[in-house]
């Protein structure tokens, strides 16, 4: 079989990818979430939870202290 026929083929070749598909892929890169983005969101969420837990703990400690103070006053 001769390769001349393959090289000189007049048949139009289909593109490997549709140009509208490649354009939409380029536009979709803005919507891609990276592992770094996820790690940052998780870290931010954990810090928010930690801050809220500290605030709750401080409020609870103040409440316990107030109860103890009242009990001490009553026992005198």
Swiss-Prot record:
Its main location: cytoplasm. The keyword Cytoplasm applies. It is found in: Cytoplasm; Bud; Bud neck. Residues 1-28 are annotated as: Disordered. It comes from the Eukaryota. One of its GO terms (cellular component) is cellular bud neck. Residues 16-26 have a biased composition (Polar residues). Keywords: Cytoplasm. Coiled coil: none annotated. One of its GO terms (biological process) is actin filament bundle assembly. Present with 656 molecules/cell in log phase SD medium. This is Uncharacterized protein YOR304C-A. It comes from Saccharomyces cerevisiae (strain ATCC 204508 / S288c) (Baker's yeast). The lineage of its organism: Eukaryota, Fungi, Dikarya, Ascomycota, Saccharomycotina.
